[in-house]
Amino acid sequence: MRSLFFGIGKSIGNFFQIVKIWRNFFMTNTRKLAYIAILSAVSFLLLYFSFPLIPAADFLKVDFSILPVLIALVIFDFKSAIGVLLLRSLLKLLLNNGGPGSMIGLPMNFVALGVFVWGLSYFWKKNQTSKNYILGSVLGTILLTVAMVVLNYIYAVPLYAKFANFDIAQFIGLYKYLFAMVVPFNLLEGLIFSVAFALIYAPLKSILVKL
């Protein structure tokens, strides 16, 4: 009889332990989803504040929508950061679709920011030192630049010519565009991303690590 009650008590204890685990799981995931939604909305709003870096190619613009994505990387992980980036891109597609140009450019922007975030997280996420931040920023900038050269060559330039009536190869010259505009633009963009996030992360670090 004693062993029976002991077994029942143990089973009840295990049941409440399982309930506690599931409660914590749902509370944690609800909190996580709320942060991702908020960061995605902020990232979308930051898309409206963009500026050109190269006067001869004023259609190549940089914005700071990556900053909330990097905050998600700090608070959670790489997958959550990509989730913020994806939701931001969907909001852009649904609420501020600029036609063929946006339809062509948005996937490229997603890839560009995604590879930059991955490069930064590869060195910096597990061990957040200044050295690893610099290494991650350099890797992210290189990956960003290479990805944009390749995607412009095989994807964007042909599609802009076909659907947006803008043949970059004819007006500027393909290789001149790639190496005199795309490469320096993305190198500068990676540098701007790295410096901007470092500047906001320093004062916010004590807050972000507690979230």
Swiss-Prot record:
Record protein name field: Riboflavin transporter RibU
Membrane-topology descriptor:
Multi-pass membrane protein
Q: What is its main location?
A: membrane
**GO MF term (any one):** riboflavin transmembrane transporter activity
Briefly, what is this protein's role? Substrate-binding (S) component of an energy-coupling factor (ECF) ABC-transporter complex. Mediates riboflavin uptake, may also transport FMN and roseoflavin. Probably a riboflavin-binding protein that interacts with the energy-coupling factor (ECF) ABC-transporter complex. Unlike classic ABC transporters this ECF transporter provides the energy necessary to transport a number of different substrates. The substrates themselves are bound by transmembrane, not extracytoplasmic soluble proteins. Expression of the complex plus RibU in E.coli allows riboflavin uptake.
Q: How does it assemble?
A: Forms a stable energy-coupling factor (ECF) transporter complex composed of 2 membrane-embedded substrate-binding proteins (S component), 2 ATP-binding proteins (A component) and 2 transmembrane proteins (T component) upon coexpression of the 4 components in E.coli.
**Which superkingdom is the protein from?**
Bacteria
> Which Pfam families does this UniProt record tie to the protein?
ECF_trnsprt
Q: Which gene is annotated as encoding this protein in its UniProt record?
A: ribU
The membrane spanning regions, by residue number, are: 34-54, 66-86, 104-124, 134-154, 180-200
Q: Where in the cell is it found?
A: Cell membrane
The cellular component terms of Gene Ontology attached to this UniProt record, alphabetical and capped at eight, are: plasma membrane
